[in-house]
Amino acid sequence: MGIKRPHASVDDIHPDRASRIEGGPAQKKYKQARKNQVDADGSLAAVKKRARNIERTLSRPGASEMPPTVRAELEREMSALKYRIESQQEKKHRSHKIGKYHMVRFFERKKAQKLVKYVRKKLDQAEDPEQIIQLKKDLHTAEVDVNYAIYFPFLERYVSLYPNTEKSDDQSDAKLALLRSERHPIWTEIEQAMESGPNALPQLQNRKSAKAATKSTKSEAASKSHPEKVSGEKFDKKGKTSDARHSKQTPKAQSDEKDEDGDESDTGFFN
């Protein structure tokens, strides 16, 4: 037979349930940020999921009653998560670009190195002063071509140095013609970086694309000018943003809007 509990212990009410039983207002509890789970997983999907959960928490009707310390902590975590998402997406995009243009860069680097050897050999054999001046220019062009194939910015679309041209009977003229053809504007930037110092070329290679730089500049300017709008921004499952006005639409208006929009785009902040 089990031992019966005394009536005093049965009648005791837990303090957390006392307000509910007596009819008082229920006290809301806010869960602490689950940083350990995100850090342990480390995947982009986990970071996006955590960011969406924070956005939903901050955009709920009762978010104004949230303690200031909890809200500040969530907003700080949200900023850190956005930075991690942008960094991981940029890293993924970088790897894609490197793999995409790896072979063409490799072959053009080898070709430029062969042209350097060829022009140096021609320069050693040349006796005409005008020819020597022209060959020195060709040698400089070939040396810049080598660095062009190596240090062309990873995040930008690679432009070939030696596109397919008509074959000539004179192989020497064909090789020199490759060095005297028109060059891409980035070629001039690489030439200037070679004169600036050893750190200039790696910086040019790892620079952000013009599109990404413009996007980050706009987002920073928006966060500085309207910080309250950035914290209240909502992200849906596909990464799209919607402000508070769209979140307050009636179900009928939302259904009409979905019918007009049709299929949503798969591109977004959290994809």
UniProtKB/Swiss-Prot annotation:
Biased segments, Basic and acidic residues type? 8-20, 217-246
The GO cellular component terms are: nucleolus; preribosome, small subunit precursor
User: Where does the protein end up?
Assistant: Nucleus, Nucleolus
* Alphabetically ordered keywords of this record: Coiled coil, Nucleus, rRNA processing
Q: Per its UniProt record, what Pfam families does this chain match? A: Efg1
GO BP terms in the entry: maturation of SSU-rRNA from tricistronic rRNA transcript (SSU-rRNA, 5.8S rRNA, LSU-rRNA)
Q: Where is the composition biased (Acidic residues)?
A: 257-271
Q: Does the keyword Nucleus apply?
A: yes
Coiled-coil segments on the chain, per record: 69-128
Keyword hit for Hydrolase = no
| Renumbered residue ranges of the record's region Disordered | 1-44, 196-271
Q: Which InterPro entries match?
A: Efg1, EFG1_rRNA-proc
Describe the family membership recorded for this protein in Swiss-Prot or TrEMBL: Belongs to the EFG1 family.
Q: What does this protein do?
A: Involved in rRNA processing.
> Can you say what this protein is called?
rRNA-processing protein EFG1
